[in-house]
Amino acid sequence: MTEYKKVIAQNKKALFNYFIEERLEAGIVLKGSEVQSLRQGKASIEESHAADTGHEVFLYNCHIAEYEKANRFNHATRRPRKLLLHTKEIKKIIGRIRIKGYTLVALSMYFNKKNKVKVELGIAKGKKLRDKRESIKEKNWKRDQSRLIRQK
């Protein structure tokens, strides 16, 4: 059975720029105005990444637009947001991203079936230029294949 996910934002560039080796789910600490803005779908995680600060993991560069109906207590749009993970998961992540070349990238943000905001993270390794070219060639070849099959 597939799990219910109402996707708020996706990072499609991450799949092109990185090799995703492992995926994991994390909760995120938000303010009330941020949740209301997310319900309207006003978020972007294109350039966002996560990093550790000792025993905690934070999401950086995630843009959540200000909620128009909030008064003066609105939130900062690009503030660092704490990710909610178990201690074992944090230690595992820190061990993996301390290796040279690995980073923690936000892949998607969504509401789960209990209406909690979750972030899907990926432990990723950056692609070189030649790898990106190969993935473009593969994508074009698959598109051409599907055209040929449809024509027959």
Curated annotation (Swiss-Prot):
A single BP term in Gene Ontology: trans-translation
Family, similarity comment: Belongs to the SmpB family.
Chief localisation class: cytoplasm
Naturally occurring in which organism (per UniProt): Rickettsia montanensis
Pfam families according to UniProt: SmpB
Signal peptide: none
Location(s), subcellular: Cytoplasm
Function: Required for rescue of stalled ribosomes mediated by trans-translation. Binds to transfer-messenger RNA (tmRNA), required for stable association of tmRNA with ribosomes. tmRNA and SmpB together mimic tRNA shape, replacing the anticodon stem-loop with SmpB. tmRNA is encoded by the ssrA gene; the 2 termini fold to resemble tRNA(Ala) and it encodes a 'tag peptide', a short internal open reading frame. During trans-translation Ala-aminoacylated tmRNA acts like a tRNA, entering the A-site of stalled ribosomes, displacing the stalled mRNA.
Record-given protein name: SsrA-binding protein
Annotated gene: smpB
